[in-house]
Structures are given as structure tokens and as C-alpha cells.
Amino acid sequence: MMIKGTRCTLVKVVTPACENEFEMRISMKLILAISVFITTALVLNVAICRAQSAPQQDVVQKQSRPSQQGEDVVRVNTNLVQTDLMVFDKQGHFVDGLQREQFELSIDGKPQAISFFERVRAGSSREQALKSNSDRTAIIPAEKPTAVNENRGRIIVFFLDDLHLSLDSLTRTRKMLTQFIENELGDNDRVAIASTSGDIGFLQQFTDNKSVLHAAVERLRQHPYNIRDMTRETTPMTEYMALTIERKDDPGVFAFYVDECLKTAPPRYPRRSCEVEVVNRARLILVQAAAVIVNTYESLESLMRTSAQMSGRKLVFFVSDGFLLDTGPRNADPRGKLTQITDAALRAGVVIYTIDARGLFSGQLDATNNVPIDIHGRLENASLREGPASQDALNALARDTGGRALRNTNYFDKWVNKVLDETANYYLLAWRPNNEEQTANDFKKIEVRVIGHPEFTVRLPHGFLSATSAALTKPTVTAQPAPSAHQEMQQALTSLQPKREVPTSLSVVFLDTPEHGPVLTVSVQIRNETLSHEEVGGKQVAAVDVVGAAVNDKGKPVETFQTRLKIDATAPRGTAQNDSVTIYNYRMPITPGLYQVRVATRDSKSGQVGSAQQWIEIPNLSLRRLSLSSLLLGLQNVKSKESSGSAAGVPQVQFSTDHHFARNSRLPFITFIYNAARGQTGNLPPNVWLQARILRAGHVIKTSPMQQVTVAVQDFARIPYGGEISLDSLPAGEYVLQVTVTDQTTRENASERARFTIE
């Protein structure tokens, strides 16, 4: 078959016999699909020109999809205040099976009736429903667990206080993060790596993409702790020594620094002048330290409020070398900021676990910690107190939000794993404030105990701000006019969580082509049944605006697109025939790198919006390393609705966009193998072997035999491979297809993964 001067030969694959339930084979239909897909890619230059010169052109395709039933819900009063808690026995094991009547709740020491109680499994769909509303307007689905959405994954944040991290601590932290990404990240987990300095930039967002998280780790840099001493003194003064002088806690410390001042002062220099210099020096150090600490608190509180947009419980690992909880009476009281952080954490469903990144730490500082030596021992007591004092803030953050603090260990990657295990289950309880005292303008202390079990340890957030007080901590927002359609689209495009008013699915596919090199295909799918139709020319027509952008890892858009899709209703609304979807495809040339594709949709009649986003890494094929294209799942012949200049109505290949498949169906997939070695002379056939695996919740449940890819093609730079997998024996649920290719000549490996759902 000749296409624009390029010869394409049909694929021939030799596969060993295998079980029917995991059949790996190439069908004639799949062979045709590969050829059609290559054809589509080869005429890419035409498609790109049309998309740029005529952004309003419709590229509409339809395919059937089963409708989904809505869930029954129970609505709970908006005044409910809820908190989660964990109960542990003396051995540190979670105590399961407790009932509501076994708990005693008190607010500011006064008994409070429990209005709602339930044991929750972290990462479940039940948890997502229970904690779906940050203002406690809880919409609680009836208990109908389903296999499809049984595991929503964990929401985890690693917040690195890099303004208080030494180089050694940063090295340990990087090692811990890398170990977590490679070995502990679950298929449905959403993880964010954030820092006080903001060095991570655009990559500081929730994702399950390992490449994004590794790139975020690579951006971590040490920030030298620049608390500068503006005086002529050479004797180092630590922040805690400065605080001791400011508070007048230890006369010996003050006397030591005054004596050191006199040693370098001119003859007959008054001792009183040195006393003033020492006090001023201490205050200057504390002012600078307070500014850095406030920056850390502000960044952490901002993280708490941003994470409130994500439904479900969140675990935050706060990593720091520690800092002072108090910087003296002349600086702002940090305890007020801590109460705001605690309140924001409770409202966002956040539990903070703090890690002292200094590792094994005796608590006593020495010369390596910039502490002067006093032969008279006047600094000894203060030095002993300095280590624990630097951990007070870490202890308070963990204690007040229901977490724990890790201290004095060099291997905190294992502790992270332990925390993830111990927080896998918890109890959720809620109450309704019933008197004026609970709505007064102050911080409310929460206490919970298990009746008859004083040996149990109960961990929970220690308090919250009343509604009035919480409102005072937020900036005043003036009334704003209703957003325009353009603003609504922009808000949906930049939303932290996908908008679901218009159910929108996104598929991003990388493919390398002979004429155009790397190509990115963006497929946007919209469910037609949710759209508002109006009669135009005797037909029921809906209009949907679509905008999208491909953004690089610096947050800079490299390609944008927009269009309006006009969709005809082919059957009465609500009928099975109308349960279809519309797919819009946009193709663009792309250079190697890490990209995020964001799309937003808007029903022009109802104003409802939808959004989706996806990361993709484009390999640099010029490095001649073994690589794979994206996995293309599903296969269906559809009719194009392209207008003038195209083959209108000609059947085309459309791969699945939402990756949803029916039980007892088959899962076709296609991938392309790049840069397979051909021996030292470059003339030998590639010796490439391939294996497919299906995973669920991180566990391999099916594996195909290793198969040699035997092909008869002229372009060995792009070796196509496809297969079909029987889904007969798999229950409904969420899965991952992983395809791994091994080049026996170079011993290189490459793999690609794609999620799919069996309904």
C-alpha cells in the first residue's frame, strides 16, 4: 500500500500459543487499523493547517457508550463540623471495630453529642463522598460499593521547607522521595511535591505521573540559610542564643557574649555599650529568623487552603531541619498562625506528619552547628535546650493536626511507608454546634476518648476556629459580576480538580512519523446526553465550546486550540440510541520534553463546563535509545464530520478516549517500537521481545509470555506491534496495561502504561 510515496507493509507477528483469556494476537482488523493510523499521521500537515487557519472547524465523531446510573444521596446539615481520628493500642496497632457509643466527644471540655460516625478506608470512593465538601456540606452516597471505583487512591503531599534544609538533609530527602516514587506510589495515588521557596514551580501540583514527580525532585536546590550578622563580632550567635538573650532566660549566655564583645573592643570601651550591642545583635538575628519562619508558615497555610479543593483525606509530610516556635516578644506571635494552620488543616481534611531531616540528632549542638565554645561552661545549658527547641514547631504542627513527628533517625523513607500503613483506616465523626459558646470568636479545643480504654491513644486535630473567627482570617472579597463565558472556560482550564458538569474525557497520544517527526494527538470526548439542545432548522442541535493547551514543564503554553462543535441529536433524548459521545481530535507537532495537556468544554446553552488534564513525556529519539509510542487502546471505525477539503464521510480509525470497556469484550492495543538495534553493521533484523501485563491496585494479575516481535516492514525505525487481550475473566474495576519491550542486542528496556476501566 503506497501512501504519499511511503511504502507500508502489513504486519506479520509470530506468537506462541497462550490461554484464551489472555490472548495476544494480531487480527486483520488490527492490521488495517495500523495502516489507517499511519495514513492519518502522514497527512498531518493538512490537519494542522486547517486547525490553525480555521479554528471553528468541527471534527466530530460518535460512538456508543452505556449510560451510568446516578447515586442515591443523603444530605447532611451544612452546620456539621467533622473530623477524622485514629485509635491505637499500646503496640501502635489501629483499633478496629469501635462503635459510636464507645466514643466521648468534648469541645472546650464540655460534652458534645456525636451526630455522625463511620469507619473509613483511606482512598476509597466512600471517603471521597464523605469528605467531598470542604465547608462541611456533606453529600453522603448510600453504601453501595462497586468494583469500578472501590479504590480512589491516596492524596499525599511532601512539603519541603527548603529554607530550613542543609545540604545533607536535602540529600536524604531526595533519596526518600525517589524511593517513594519508585516503590510506594500507587496506581490511583495523587501526589504533590511542594517547597517553601517555590523552586518546583509549575510541577508543584497533584499528579500520579512518575516522570513529573522525578522532575520535581530534580528541581530541589539548597538555599543557604542567610541569617546575617550585621555587626563586627566574629563570635557566632545562634537564633536560640539570641532568643535566650532577648528573654533574659540565662544570664550566663548574656555575660558570655558581652565578654566576647569586650575582647575585641577598643581599650576602655564601656561594658554598658557592649551590653547594648549584644541585645541589638540578638534582636536583629531574631527579626531575620522570624521573617523566614513566617514565609514557611504562609506557604504551609496556603497549601492547606489549596488542598481543600481536593476531596478526600490528605497526608502532608512536612520535611525540615526545624526552627524556633517563638522568636521573641518583638515579633509576631506564631501561635496565632499555628491555630490558623490547624483550622485550615481540619477543614481541608489534612493530617501533617513532620520529619526532622537532620536525621540522627542528639539534641545537643556542637561546633559543627556554629555554636561557640565557652571554657567556663556558661553556654552548656542553653546548648542542651537548643536542639529540642528547634523541634518544638515540628512537634506542634504534627500534634495539633492529628499526626506524628519523626525525630532522630537517618532512614525516614521507612517511616513514610509506616505512616501510609497506619493511616490506611480511620474513624470519621461529626457534630453540630448547638450553643452560642461554640460559635464564639475563638479557637475551639477538640478532645475525644474511648470510654473504658484509657490505654488507647487517640490522634486527631486538636481544634478549629469558629465560623466567625475563621471568616476573620480570610481576606475580604468584594462582590464580583458573574463571569463571562471566556472566564468560565479559563477557570475550568486551570482548575485543580476536573470539572464534571459536562463529562469530559481526555486522551493524549505520542507517535513518531517519517515526515513530521514527533506528533501529539489530543482527543477530547464529551457525553452527548448531558448537553442542552435547541431546535435549529427542525433539528435538535447542541453547541459545545472546546479550548485546550499543551504546556511545557515551565508552565509555558507551546500550543493552544479552540473550536465550537455543533452536535445533532440523532434520536429522542433519553433513548438508548442517544447515549453517545462526541470526540474532537487535534494534532500538533511536538518536541521532546515533559508536557501537560489541559482541555475545557462548555455547553453554550446551559453554561455548564467540564475539564480534564493529562501529562505526557515525549522521548528524545535522536539519542537512539529504545523507546515506545503511547499505547493506543480500543478500536472502532467511525465517520468523520470534517468539512471541505477532506474526505467527508470516509470511515476512519478512532481509538478509545475514555478507556472504558465492557466485560466479556476484547481489548485491542497498538504501540510502535522506536530505535531497535540492528547489529553493528545496521543491516540485521531487530531482535526485540515484548511482554504485556495487566495490573490492578499495583498487583500483577495477568502476564503474557515473552514474545519475539517478528515483522516485515521497510521502516525498522518504527516497528508497529498490536495485540488483543480477552477481558472475559476480569471483574469490573480499574486496571493498568503495561507493555514492556526488550532489545536483546543492547539489553535495553522500554515500557509504556495505560489505564483502562472494565464496566
Regions found by a protein language model. Give the residues of each.
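Bacterial N-terminal signal peptides
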Residues: 33-45
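Scaffold/interface architecture of coatomer-like assemblies
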Residues: 49-759
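Positively charged n-region of N-terminal signal peptides that target proteins for export
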Residues: 24-31
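Acidic, Ala/Val/Gly-enriched low-complexity intrinsically disordered segments
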Residues: 11-23
